[in-house]
Amino acid sequence: GDFLSLKHDARLTEFSVDVHRSDFYMAVLRVVVYQTDKEHKVFTPLLKEPIYIEVFPSGEPQTFSRKISVFVPKGEAWVGIQFVEMRGKDYDRFFFPSTINTCYIRFTDGKIRPLNKRLGIPFSVKGYDYIVVNE
């Protein structure tokens, strides 16, 4: 995943991720959105219901988009994907296109580390600022 620094409250409306190739006969990813503190020690989930992406085998690139509606308070947030389930043979592979942008992994102990020295998994998030205007 990656961190967002928001100057205003925001509403996230769409999440998209590309998969370059999947050999697994079933792979399930989960979209995650957390509010976090500046030190990235505390993560509070913002999605009320889980959003899953089912990836079926294909040697061709695929793009998966999901409509979402998530209110994110101003400050720091973390958006990413988690692997939920992978079914296949021992030699099956799952490929994302990569970027040179930093991508972070959140481990079960809560620690955050960059993935492979500036190797990232690209995804996109659409949304808009949520500003209340007094009349």
Language-model features: locations:
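Exposed aromatic-hydrophobic patches
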Residues: E60-V70
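Eukaryote-biased detector of low-complexity, proline/serine/threonine-rich segments
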Residues: V70-E76
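Residue-level detector of beta-propeller blades
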Residues: K41, P45-L46, P114
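Well-ordered beta-strand positions in beta-sheet-rich domains
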Residues: G1-F3, P50, T63-S65
